[in-house]
Amino acid sequence: MWIFYAIGSSFFAGITAILAKCGIKKTDSNVATAIRTVVVLLFSWLMVLITGTWGGIMQIDGRTLLFLILSGMATGASWLCYFHALQKGDINKVVPIDKSSTVLSILLALIFLHEGVTGAKIVSLVLIGSGTMMMITKKDIEIDQGKKSGGWLIYAVLSAVFASLTSILGKIGIEGIDSNLGTAIRTTVVLFMAWIMVFVTGKQKEIKKIEKKEFCFISLSGLATGASWLCYYRALQEGPASVVVPIDKLSMLVTLAFSWLVFHERLTKKGAVGVLLITVGTVMLAITA
């Protein structure tokens, strides 16, 4: 039964970007991020209740709380950049670049956490890095540089950078407390950050203007994230992590498949090879972890 939960985790994670893209055709990406974070926050605290770890709040010291807040701020910045990139660019290019945060995370872990590097890790990094570079064309760079406000590429790269910082800060902050509780606290920080961004940019007036259809898609993207978390947790409870984690990492393929079906986005031959390299590298990294 756990295999179905693992597949469900990958599926729901994969369709999150698709649902979000459908919800930000006219809606400002910052507003959409703030709305969906409300839904994600409910799921994150639901996970805390399910695992019965809410009592650990009283045991969190000042240092741990500080790093959890910093991690939450990095997560918020990553989400804001990610959905802005999705609004401006193609899913089949934004998502693979965002996934390259794995490379940065490992490099930062090596520098700041002094984690070891195995031969398998190096091969995985080379595959993911090479695959990501193959996804970016010269035309993408030229278009991005030609826009005063910045195109999708710069936001996709920033999303990956902030996501990598999230994992490092989160690892430091989550030491000694349950990961589900840590995630819930981080998501709470993200919620405040997202709504502050909405009010600072004066976008709060647009909330009333959101079309019902787009509001539904934005909410569904949050539900998809929550459903993915629940399935992933259940799969890890019943099945081996060595199989569950790689299956979850295949969510990118689900995203790319739906981007072709829903938005008719097509990969170039070079891009397809890039996706293959990223997938192999990611799965290899998950299996050898």
Tell where the protein language model's regions lie, with residue ranges.
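Selected transmembrane alpha-helices and immediately adjacent juxtamembrane segments
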Residues: K148-L181
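Hydrophobic/small/kink-forming positions within alpha-helical transmembrane segments
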Residues: G14, I18, W45, G72-A77, ...
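Residues that define the loop-to-transmembrane-helix transition and helix capping
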Residues: N30-V31, N92, T118, N180-L181, ...
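Alpha-helical transmembrane segments of compact multi-pass small-molecule transporters, enriched
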Residues: V38-F43, I97-I111, V189-M193, I247-L261, ...
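Juxtamembrane helix-loop boundary signature in multi-pass membrane transporters
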Residues: M1-G8, V103-V161, T268-A289
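Hydrophobic core positions of alpha-helical segments in small-molecule transporters
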Residues: G8, I35-R36, L70, I97-S100, ...
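Hydrophobic/aromatic residues within transmembrane alpha-helices
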Residues: G23, A32, A85, I111-L113, ...
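Membrane-interface interhelical linkers
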Residues: M1-F12, A20-L68, W79-G89, T137-Y155, ...
